[in-house]
Every structure is written in C-alpha cells, then in structure tokens.
Amino acid sequence: MISYLKGIVAGIQNVGSNRVILTLEVNGMGYDLQIPQRLAKQLPTTGDLVQIFTHYQVREEIPLLYGFSSPAERDLFRHLLSVSGVGAASAIALLDTLELPDLVQAIIAANVQILIQAPGVGKKIAERVCLELKAKLIEWRKSAGFFVATEGPAPGILEEVQMTLFALGYTAHEVSHALHVVSEDIGLPKDAYVEDWIKQAIAHLSSSEQVSH
C-alpha cells in the first residue's frame, strides 16, 4: 500500500463538479490523485516539491489514488468511507465543507444541519455518519491531537441560529468558526437567546469580512 508520495507538482485540474486532479511527478513517473479542493488551494505552484498522503482504492476494477494534506485528513476520509452509503465524492465534499476539527466535532455532536451543507450529502446520509462514527471519532480525535471544541448554543437553539446564518449566505465553515469564537472568546452562555447568538455571530463575521478587505 502507498502511504504517501513526495514529488513535484506537475499540474492541477478541475475535471468536474467538486473533482480536482493533482498530477504529481515522482522519480520520473506521473501519478494522478484526486484531492479535496481545500488542498488544491493550499498547494504551491507547479514545479515545487510536496508530500501528499494517499489512499488507494479499486472501484469497478479501476485503481484510484486519493491525496490528502495530512495523515489525519486521510484517516478521517477512511472513516467516512466506512459508513454505509458514503462514497468518495461525499467524503471529499464533507472534508471540503469544514476544517478537520470542526467536521469531527459536528459528527460527534450529531450536527446534521452543518453536515448537509456539503454538496451531495442529504439528511439521511448525515444522520448515518453521526450514528456510525460518533463513538469512533471520540477516541480517534484524541490520538489525532484535535482540540475539544466548546459546545456552542444549546441543541434547540443551534439549529435556528445556523439556519438563519445559512440563509444570510454564510458558509458552514464560517458559521462553525463564528459560533466557536462567540462561545469561547466572548463567553456567551449556551442557553442565551437565539437573537443574542445571531447578533454576536454576525458581528464577528462582519468584522472578519472588513479585515479581509
């Protein structure tokens, strides 16, 4: 089994919706690896040396290589593939939607509303991911070195806050990060009013947008 490849970036191309292929030249041979869009944005320009952690899969007798930025990202991809009904496309979509620690926390907390923001991931699949992986990821994230995220809003409040922020056009990653900041840095109680969570989250998101500009 190929654990990782270290080589020169020969090219990156989008070959379809949410499908990115990295061509990596290793010792004179070119390897095509499907990678998350998030990784594609992080990679250096063509000609630079990189290390990519890999997952090898044979589908319909066709060998496929998937590439990831870290062993933890690859391991989480494998955990997702172990869930009934989850294929590589859905697993990569989930990895692209949230940062690794946020995705792990969303699964452990059974935060279906966040998970269904990933393209091609419906409510039933999201619920199955939470059901089948929660116990595994509670243990796995310790060995992976992920922080234990704060709870954020209480479950009854969380869904309403998320749906409001999604309706305003914010992404799952932006919403997850904003709620973490509001809970951790501002110290808003998890049972505070919905309006307070929304107000504080929008304030943080607006300030972040101003900084980026």
From Swiss-Prot:
Gene Ontology molecular functions: ATP binding; four-way junction DNA binding; four-way junction helicase activity
Region (Domain II): 70-148
Subcellular location: Cytoplasm
An annotated GO cellular component: Holliday junction resolvase complex
Organism: Nostoc sp. (strain PCC 7120 / SAG 25.82 / UTEX 2576)
Short name of any one Pfam family annotated for the protein: HHH_5
Protein name: Holliday junction branch migration complex subunit RuvA
Domain notes from UniProt: Has three domains with a flexible linker between the domains II and III and assumes an 'L' shape. Domain III is highly mobile and contacts RuvB.
UniProt keyword Magnesium, yes or no: no
Tree of life domain: Bacteria
Known role: The RuvA-RuvB-RuvC complex processes Holliday junction (HJ) DNA during genetic recombination and DNA repair, while the RuvA-RuvB complex plays an important role in the rescue of blocked DNA replication forks via replication fork reversal (RFR). RuvA specifically binds to HJ cruciform DNA, conferring on it an open structure. The RuvB hexamer acts as an ATP-dependent pump, pulling dsDNA into and through the RuvAB complex. HJ branch migration allows RuvC to scan DNA until it finds its consensus sequence, where it cleaves and resolves the cruciform DNA.
Region (Domain I): 1-69
Keywords per UniProt: Cytoplasm, DNA damage, DNA recombination, DNA repair, DNA-binding
GO BP: any one term: DNA repair
Gene from which this protein is expressed: ruvA
SUPFAM superfamilies (UniProt xref): DNA helicase RuvA subunit, C-terminal domain, Nucleic acid-binding proteins, RuvA domain 2-like
Coiled coil: none
Family: Belongs to the RuvA family.
Chief localization: cytoplasm
Region (Flexible linker): 149-158
Positions of region (Domain III): 158-213
Subunit structure comment from the entry: Homotetramer. Forms an RuvA(8)-RuvB(12)-Holliday junction (HJ) complex. HJ DNA is sandwiched between 2 RuvA tetramers; dsDNA enters through RuvA and exits via RuvB. An RuvB hexamer assembles on each DNA strand where it exits the tetramer. Each RuvB hexamer is contacted by two RuvA subunits (via domain III) on 2 adjacent RuvB subunits; this complex drives branch migration. In the full resolvosome a probable DNA-RuvA(4)-RuvB(12)-RuvC(2) complex forms which resolves the HJ.
NCBIfam families xrefs: ruvA
The organism's taxonomic lineage, starting at the top: Bacteria, Bacillati, Cyanobacteriota, Cyanophyceae, Nostocales
